[in-house]
């Protein structure tokens, strides 16, 4: 007859085994047996049998020993189990929440609605990277005709760091940067696959809890609040039930309409935050970069300008990896490049290596473009840095009260939030241009080794390493009325 039980204790030559029916047995000890191991044995292996009915005292001792072993094993398992580093919500129309560790590996997949439960039953995504997990989810959604691969529907992804929002905490900043890297990698992976477009939002643990209490995914909840910022009538139930692709595209359309006064004459600009006082224009300090590059950038001639005649165009260097635009604008006279940046004035910023391309906002994302329409999308009011008045912040002319800031290392435009983190993300130091000291570069306040640069025409904050990086991170400041 076969028996199965757990090893409770080892003696010199025997092992005490407890079975599920609370019987305790002594069997011969073998080299492979250890405390806590589940073993099978036969009557031939039993040295002495002690029934709980015959020896009540021994049965109690076995039971206590069993409980102690279970508790010890539970403690070991809990110590081994990795901590949830962050929560990633994915909305296609099925909605999921993925728990990840600090390496970006999946710990758990939680379906948030009935459609997600159907798909989740078909998936095996334990112990793989979150990028691969979401790719598997997208493939399953394509098979189920939830995503139209030919039209590249949007999917909504939110990231929530599993830590209280302590902006001044070094641990918070370190873990936030680690999560940003994971999310950037995830976004690049999805977009390179060509299966879908990605719209990414960030949330904190309080927003996640608020979303859970209202029975909505974190991503949809953040999107709902973005809609409220745009003064658009959207109920929470609509945000919960709407097709996520339609929801994102509608929000982007509303944002685009509100940015163009001609198309949306009823637009009312959001008031500038009360903390920002009107300043008499004064020269802003121009500190040196915190991390000086190891090699001095090759000197390039500064752009020639004329105060009384049309400006002379400067040939655009051809970048080695950034796509060369097929159409270059005809140079036109522009205001004189600013030697110094002063608070309170409006400015445009022209790329040093893509002449005629200006920093602008499109669908609340920062990028460089020629022929900006409306031109106000490329104009920014220079105000004292929200986190440090010796630095600067960029306030949108189209949207007063909205500022350029970095999020997941992308440069975006966002409505002012009264938090230290927002103020730091929206603050930049003006430093001599990486490619030409007569021009300017913008150093992130809270990531001092990263600078605003364009890549594939979109704006990021990144570390500057190559000659191309230096050129992409250098701009010409131009005063405008």
UniProtKB/Swiss-Prot annotation:
<dbReference type="GO" id="GO:0046556">
    <property type="term" value="F:alpha-L-arabinofuranosidase activity"/>
</dbReference>
<keyword id="KW-0472">Membrane</keyword>
<dbReference type="InterPro" id="IPR055431">
    <property type="entry name" value="RsgI_M"/>
</dbReference>
<feature type="domain" description="RsgI N-terminal anti-sigma">
    <location>
        <begin position="3"/>
        <end position="50"/>
    </location>
</feature>
<feature type="topological domain" description="Extracellular">
    <location>
        <begin position="72"/>
        <end position="481"/>
    </location>
</feature>
<feature type="compositionally biased region" description="Low complexity">
    <location>
        <begin position="291"/>
        <end position="315"/>
    </location>
</feature>
<feature type="transmembrane region" description="Helical">
    <location>
        <begin position="51"/>
        <end position="71"/>
    </location>
</feature>
<comment type="function">
    <text>Anti-sigma factor for SigI5. Negatively regulates SigI5 activity through direct interaction. Binding of the polysaccharide substrate to the extracellular C-terminal sensing domain of RsgI5 may induce a conformational change in its N-terminal cytoplasmic region, leading to the release and activation of SigI5.</text>
</comment>
<feature type="region of interest" description="Disordered">
    <location>
        <begin position="255"/>
        <end position="339"/>
    </location>
</feature>
<dbReference type="InterPro" id="IPR036195">
    <property type="entry name" value="AbfB_ABD_sf"/>
</dbReference>
<dbReference type="Pfam" id="PF05270">
    <property type="entry name" value="AbfB"/>
</dbReference>
<feature type="compositionally biased region" description="Low complexity">
    <location>
        <begin position="266"/>
        <end position="283"/>
    </location>
</feature>
<dbReference type="InterPro" id="IPR007934">
    <property type="entry name" value="AbfB_ABD"/>
</dbReference>
<dbReference type="Pfam" id="PF12791">
    <property type="entry name" value="RsgI_N"/>
</dbReference>
<dbReference type="Pfam" id="PF23750">
    <property type="entry name" value="RsgI_M"/>
</dbReference>
<dbReference type="GO" id="GO:0005886">
    <property type="term" value="C:plasma membrane"/>
</dbReference>
<feature type="compositionally biased region" description="Basic and acidic residues">
    <location>
        <begin position="256"/>
        <end position="265"/>
    </location>
</feature>
<feature type="compositionally biased region" description="Pro residues">
    <location>
        <begin position="316"/>
        <end position="336"/>
    </location>
</feature>
<comment type="subunit">
    <text>Interacts (via RsgI N-terminal anti-sigma domain) with SigI5.</text>
</comment>
<feature type="topological domain" description="Cytoplasmic">
    <location>
        <begin position="1"/>
        <end position="50"/>
    </location>
</feature>
<keyword id="KW-0812">Transmembrane</keyword>
<keyword id="KW-1133">Transmembrane helix</keyword>
<protein>
    <recommendedName>
        <fullName>Anti-sigma-I factor RsgI5</fullName>
    </recommendedName>
</protein>
<keyword id="KW-1003">Cell membrane</keyword>
<dbReference type="InterPro" id="IPR024449">
    <property type="entry name" value="Anti-sigma_RsgI_N"/>
</dbReference>
<dbReference type="GO" id="GO:0046373">
    <property type="term" value="P:L-arabinose metabolic process"/>
</dbReference>
